[in-house]
Amino acid sequence: MQSRYEPVFEREMGCTEAEWLGWLPAAVGACAWQRNGQSATVEVPPGALALRWETRPPRVIALMRMPVLHVHFTFSGLDDAQRYQFMRRFDLYMQRGGG
């Protein structure tokens, strides 16, 4: 989790598209969302979040292969505090492993 989220940013997720789509409903909580191919729009009152993703080649470390999903986040109509509040939940639901 970050202390601040810019209106537009990108990140790499260590998951497949199928995993991402399985986690997305819980990550956005009560916010309505709609998928369109490799993108989605999430209604985050009073604004919105546009997501775009693309599968990248996996990371290979010795015999381990980790999937890579490159995700673009574009917020509109939300201030810093509103973006932070949404992303705090989103990141907690998307977080895997750790330690």
Positions of predicted regions on the chain:
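Short, conserved charged micro-motifs
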Residues: 17-22, 79-85
